[in-house]
Design a protein with these regions (language model features):
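C-terminal ends and interior cores of transmembrane alpha-helices
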Residues: 85-104
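Residue-level signature of mid-helix packing/kink "hotspots" within the transmembrane helices
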Residues: 56-64, 154-155, 159
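Helix-loop boundary and gating motifs at the non-cytosolic
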Residues: 2-60
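Cytoplasmic membrane-interface "Motif A"-like loop-to-helix N-cap segments
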Residues: 71-85
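Cytoplasmic helix-loop-helix junction between adjacent transmembrane helices
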Residues: 113-149
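Symmetry-related core transmembrane helices of the 12-TM Major Facilitator Superfamily/SLC fold
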Residues: 157, 172-176
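Small-residue (Gly/Pro/Ala) motifs that create kinks and tight helix-helix packing interfaces
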Residues: 34, 66, 156-165
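Helix-to-loop junctions at the C-terminal end of transmembrane segments
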Residues: 61-75, 164-166
Length: 176
């Protein structure tokens, strides 16, 4: 059985490349997030657990919002572009807002981080996967082959994240 990867299909190229780049950007900081929080910022296990649970709860709310809005938008991309804008702000947010707030006012940092990560990454992953699946159905390509580029991107990003993290975690944030 031959694998059919339709590189000539512009919609496939968009979905695959966006997925690839999204997951690279996510893995550059997320793959070592807990290590950064505990080792670099000195958060306790309780603070880590609280942070993760609030992040996930907030992302569930944004997933519902994204789902309702994107269903109405169909294949229009305003939410995708909003999410892209949030991703571009990762470096400045992590270094100049999130890190100082977690160290000086944990509760405010917790809330702002949950909003940022929910909008950009945690719920954004579901938005991207749903959008890619809709594109696959409408423009005749396999969702799995397009989504595989995201997994490949995450693996590449995680590999380089470890290298850059050993130099400075801030490098990872700026590379996003």
């Amino acid at each position: 059985m031959a694998l059919n990867i339709p590189f000539r299909n512009a919609y496939y190229r968009f979905a695959s490349s966006y997925s690839f780049l999204f997951f690279i950007s996510w893995s550059l900081w997320w793959s070592l997030y807990a290590i950064w929080l505990k080792g670099h910022l000195g958060l306790t296990g309780t603070e880590l657990g609280t942070l993760y649970s609030v992040n996930q709860f907030t992302s569930i709310l944004f997933m519902m919002f994204y789902g309702i809005v994107q269903d109405k938008l169909g294949l229009k991309k305003p939410l995708i572009w909003c999410m892209s804008f949030i991703l571009v702000l990762t470096g400045p947010f992590m270094i100049y807002v999130y890190e100082p707030l977690l160290q000086s006012n944990f509760s405010v940092g917790l809330i702002l981080g949950a909003l940022f990560f929910g909008l950009g990454y945690l719920a954004g992953c579901g938005l991207l996967d749903s959008f890619t699946e809709k594109m696959a159905r409408n423009f005749h390509f396999e969702y799995g082959t397009a989504r595989a580029w995201g997994s490949f991107g995450y693996a590449i990003g995680a590999f380089f994240a470890g290298i850059f993290f050993s130099i400075s975690p801030h490098i990872n944030f700026w590379l996003v």
